[in-house]
């Protein structure tokens, strides 16, 4: 289990100066050729998403203005707050900020031939499935994960195991991404 606080994470500026990324975790850890990766991006200007052949990207707008996504003749989509949207990461996707507002989004990328992610918003206590990887990011409220208290802009990632996330207040929202390994693959085989 790895814990993080977005306010304390290192920031990597994009080459095109249109934004910045805070990498949460990758699996396998510290590998450039990852099977899955979670990150938070701040987007300050219109531009294209980086290409990642053989990967799927799920992007969830956390805050800021809506973002219009366009991929030639494949899709046009308006990204709205807390509504995950998946697309192939090997296609050119242009992002246009609405009303010129900066936005912040959560990204999870998975290698299509190894694993698949599912992203959802939780508003009550839940338990993850065992032997699957995952990432949580607190949008608001106070959540208990094991002996650790997680609050706004904090989270955790893990590579396997069963975990209970307990909402400690009447209301709260948490982004949860679960990683499912495809047949013939498991975390034990790739470490």
UniProtKB/Swiss-Prot annotation:
Gene3D superfamilies: Jelly Rolls. Pfam families: HutD. InterPro entries: RmlC-like_jellyroll, RmlC_Cupin_sf, Uncharacterised_HutD/Ves, Uncharacterised_Ves. Coiled coil: none annotated. It comes from the Bacteria. Belongs to the Ves family. This is Protein Ves. It comes from Escherichia coli (strain SE11). The gene is ves.
